[in-house]
């Protein structure tokens, strides 16, 4: 299930574009997630009061959390599948503290793909999208394995 060097190159090439504005990209990803899957908003006490897209766009906290999410994901992607050290604390917090189901990680993966395609169509064509989907699936599978080790079946 690993990615080839060429696939990692495609993933990290577009990720370089994301890193020019992590907070902005992250905010867009979270807005897309919450609009497409409103049930995910219930996992975020800090954001439950944000009922409209305008509210979400005005929220500095949402922007900051988007930055946090994409910073963590970028750190994992840059490890090219060798992300055990980065993944363990993330899985621990998402399983035991936040209780985030794997399904929600699928939802945010979809949101990431959508946002990257809309913001960077030239760098995120079919091959790059396929590579990113594969990288995100690798991440989710590894998180799911950690969840299982922790006894969380979300």
Swiss-Prot record:
Subcellular location: Cytoplasm, Sarcoplasm
Keywords of the record: Cytoplasm, Heme, Iron, Metal-binding, Muscle protein, Oxidoreductase, Oxygen transport, Phosphoprotein, Transport
GO MF, one annotated term: oxygen binding
Domain of life of the organism encoding this protein: Eukaryota
Ranges for domain Globin: 2-148
EC annotation from Swiss-Prot or TrEMBL: 1.7.-.-, 1.11.1.-
Main location class: cytoplasm
A single GO cellular-component term on record: sarcoplasm
Biological process annotations from GO: removal of superoxide radicals
Function field: Monomeric heme protein which primary function is to store oxygen and facilitate its diffusion within muscle tissues. Reversibly binds oxygen through a pentacoordinated heme iron and enables its timely and efficient release as needed during periods of heightened demand. Depending on the oxidative conditions of tissues and cells, and in addition to its ability to bind oxygen, it also has a nitrite reductase activity whereby it regulates the production of bioactive nitric oxide.
Disulfide-linked positions: none
Phosphothreonine PTM sites in chain numbering: 68
InterPro entries: Globin, Globin-like_sf, Myoglobin
CDD domains, alphabetized: Mb
Residues at which heme b binds: 94
Sites where the protein binds nitrite: 65
Record's keyword annotation contains Oxidoreductase: yes
Organism: Phoca vitulina
Transmembrane segments: none
Family: Belongs to the globin family.
Protein name according to UniProt: Myoglobin
Binding-site residues for O2, renumbered to this chain: 65
Lineage, opening ranks: Eukaryota, Metazoa, Chordata, Craniata, Vertebrata
Subunit details: Monomeric.
Uppermost EC category: oxidoreductase
Catalytic activity annotation: Fe(III)-heme b-[protein] + nitric oxide + H2O = Fe(II)-heme b-[protein] + nitrite + 2 H(+); H2O2 + AH2 = A + 2 H2O
């Amino acid at each position: 299930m690993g990615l080839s060097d060429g696939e990692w190159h495609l993933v990290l090439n577009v990720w370089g574009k994301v890193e020019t504005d992590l907070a902005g990209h992250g905010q867009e990803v979270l807005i897309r997630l919450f609009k497409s899957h409103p049930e995910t908003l219930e996992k975020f006490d800090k954001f439950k009061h944000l009922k409209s897209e305008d509210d979400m766009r005005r929220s500095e906290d949402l922007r900051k959390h988007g930055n946090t999410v994409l910073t963590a994901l970028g750190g994992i992607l840059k490890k090219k599948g060798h992300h055990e050290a980065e993944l363990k604390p993330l899985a621990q917090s998402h399983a035991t503290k936040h209780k985030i189901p794997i399904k929600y990680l699928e939802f945010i993966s979809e949101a990431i793909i959508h946002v990257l395609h809309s913001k960077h169509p030239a760098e995120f064509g079919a091959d790059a999208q396929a590579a990113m989907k594969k990288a995100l699936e690798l991440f989710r599978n590894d998180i799911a394995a950690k969840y299982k080790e922790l006894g969380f079946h979300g």
